[in-house]
């Protein structure tokens, strides 16, 4: 018996023809290579610039773009309600979310694909981030923020007119965010802010592992590589933090509140495995989005001194002294503080790429078009947030767009449209429940920084220099897309404000 040698060229041509013309997603436009293969999506995921790549594709092909054979990106403000809203015929795309599970049946509220399980557990989780509980976390947050500010103050030169630094605020914000989430989960700190070799090494391991988990969603075969396993130090940190939270006598940690949570209708509890799974997600994903939002906001303020001054004026008008700035309800009333965060997260979302959803049996109608069963779809947050249909001068940093009220109906209508389009914490039943907590944490940090210091940017790698289709004005913050967004760096010089009063308030003298 003889065997014919397989004709690889013919096989490739046949597969390509079927994917381009006969595939269930073939009606959606996109580059021919993207229609044939996932290699471009994998490449840009590896580069960390997939959100910007999707923006370029949408500028060329329109609102619907096929960026991989079975993946369609939808750039339209209605996609949030049509795809991510309640009772939609979609589920989380398991290939993307399964790498984040400790075991196949060991799921967190965030990465479970089971709609009923998510609904039950999310109802409990929402209680952890209600206004009733936010004040309970204030002390843990304040302790770490004060330590952060103490270190910044100690680095000042004796000559108060000389700028300190430069220091990498992107790294510093990541450090304090990791410390805060560790203390919120376990009631204890790890010592990230100490800056010792052990904590610095673990921080590097965490960042690398988050990136690896993200890449596994695009290329699952990578999990066979030994380098894609967590390091021993990382595994110990996750396990120990979870166990400490379970053993802690404090009632104000996330773990303690998860254990105490009850579903009023069904009397459902978080099991120990549920707690560990959610604690793991908080530890890995709960800090990167916070640090990203803080870094982005500081970046845009540094490059827009007028807006920086307006924020400072608001803070001085609300808080007579530095010590009056606390993680409480009064901080939530700082309208301009909220506006600069909203605008920064629009231009540099903490989760800039799309969160994929698998279309269920019977298909779905999204943004006026039918999408067949089995197609993976999602909203490209970065691209939608720079769409001129929803924002005046979409690439320009304009916090005032979020401060409209009923006295200006036109501006108010534009703000409502912008609110529909910009969803940095996602939308619907799967939206991030910790938005209010993130604002308290970041709001406290930013308010104290702006209140205490004059700051200026240093020429660094924080600005994207490449030319992007449709973007000819404004600045693009250099983010590396992973589980959330990691910033390349943000180098800053700073000094105490020159009124001479702040120094006593910050140092406590």
Curated annotation (Swiss-Prot):
Query: Which residues does heme bind?
Result: 432
One of the entry's Gene Ontology molecular-function terms is:
heme binding
What Enzyme Commission number(s) apply to this enzyme? 1.-.-.-
* Cofactor(s) demanded: heme
Q: Which SUPFAM superfamilies match?
A: Cytochrome P450
| A matching Pfam family | p450
- Which keywords label this protein? Heme, Iron, Metal-binding, Monooxygenase, Oxidoreductase, Virulence
Other information: Gene clusters encoding host-selective toxins (HSTs) are localized on conditionally dispensable chromosomes (CDCs), also called supernumerary chromosomes, where they are present in multiple copies. The CDCs are not essential for saprophytic growth but controls host-selective pathogenicity.
Question: What protein family is recorded?
Answer: Belongs to the cytochrome P450 family.
Tell me, what does this protein do in biology?
Answer: Cytochrome P450 monooxygenase; part of the gene clusters that mediate the biosynthesis of the host-selective toxins (HSTs) AF-toxins responsible for Alternaria black spot of strawberry disease by the strawberry pathotype. AF-toxin I and III are valine derivatives of 2,3-dyhydroxy-isovaleric acid and 2-hydroxy-isovaleric acid respectively, while AF II is an isoleucine derivative of 2-hydroxy-valeric acid. These derivatives are bound to a 9,10-epoxy-8-hydroxy-9-methyl-decatrienoic acid (EDA) moiety.
Name assigned to this protein: Cytochrome P450 monooxygenase AFT11-1
Q: Which gene encodes it?
A: AFT11-1
């Amino acid at each position: 018996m003889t065997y014919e040698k397989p004709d690889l060229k013919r096989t490739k041509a046949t597969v390509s023809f079927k994917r381009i013309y006969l595939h269930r997603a073939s009606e959606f436009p996109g580059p021919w290579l993207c229609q044939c293969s996932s290699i471009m999506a994998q490449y840009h995921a590896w580069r960390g610039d997939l959100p910007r790549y999707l923006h370029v594709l949408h500028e060329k092909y329109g609102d619907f773009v096929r960026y991989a054979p079975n993946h369609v990106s939808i750039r339209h403000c209605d996609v949030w309600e049509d795809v991510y809203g309640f009772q939609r015929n979609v589920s989380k795309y398991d290939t993307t979310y399964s790498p984040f599970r400790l075991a196949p049946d060991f799921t967190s509220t965030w990465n479970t694909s089971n709609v009923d399980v998510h609904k039950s557990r999310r109802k409990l989780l929402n209680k952890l981030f209600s206004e009733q509980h936010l004040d309970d976390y204030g002390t843990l947050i304040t302790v770490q923020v004060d330590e952060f500010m103490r270190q910044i103050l100690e680095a000042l030169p004796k000559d108060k007119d000389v700028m300190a630094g430069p220091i990498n605020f992107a790294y510093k914000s990541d450090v304090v965010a990791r410390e805060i989430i560790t203390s919120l989960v376990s009631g204890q700190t790890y010592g990230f802010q100490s800056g010792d070799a052990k904590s610095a090494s673990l921080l590097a391991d965490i960042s690398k592992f988050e990136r690896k988990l993200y890449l596994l969603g695009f290329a699952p075969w990578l999990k066979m590589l030994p380098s894609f396993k967590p390091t021993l130090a990382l595994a110990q940190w996750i396990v120990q933090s979870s166990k400490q939270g379970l053993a802690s006598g404090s009632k104000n940690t996330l773990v303690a509140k998860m254990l105490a949570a009850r579903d009023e209708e069904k009397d459902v509890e978080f099991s120990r495995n549920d707690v560990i799974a959610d604690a793991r997600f908080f530890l890995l994903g709960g800090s990167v989005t916070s640090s990203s939002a803080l870094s982005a906001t500081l970046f845009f303020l540094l490059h827009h001194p007028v807006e920086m001054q307006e924020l400072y004026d608001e803070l001085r008008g609300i808080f007579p002294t530095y010590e009056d700035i606390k993680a409480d309800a009064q901080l939530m009333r700082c309208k301009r503080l909220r506006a600069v965060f909203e605008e920064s997260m629009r231009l540099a979302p903490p989760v800039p790429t799309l969160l994929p959803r698998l279309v269920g049996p019977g298909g779905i109608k999204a943004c006026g078009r039918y999408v067949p069963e089995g197609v993976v779809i999602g909203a490209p947050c970065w691209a939608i947030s720079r769409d001129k249909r929803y924002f005046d001068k979409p690439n320009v940093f304009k916090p005032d767009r979020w401060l409209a009220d009923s006295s200006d109906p036109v501006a108010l209508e534009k703000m409502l449209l912008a609110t529909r389009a910009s969803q940095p914490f996602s939308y619907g039943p799967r939206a991030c429940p910790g938005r209010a907590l993130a604002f308290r944490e970041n709001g406290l940090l930013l308010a104290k920084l702006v209140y205490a210091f004059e700051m200026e940017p240093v020429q660094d790698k924080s600005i994207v220099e490449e030319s992007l289709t449709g973007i000819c004005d404004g600045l693009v913050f250099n983010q590396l897309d992973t589980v959330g967004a990691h910033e390349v760096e943000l180098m800053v010089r700073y000094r105490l404000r020159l009124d001479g009063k702040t120094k006593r308030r910050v140092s406590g003298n």
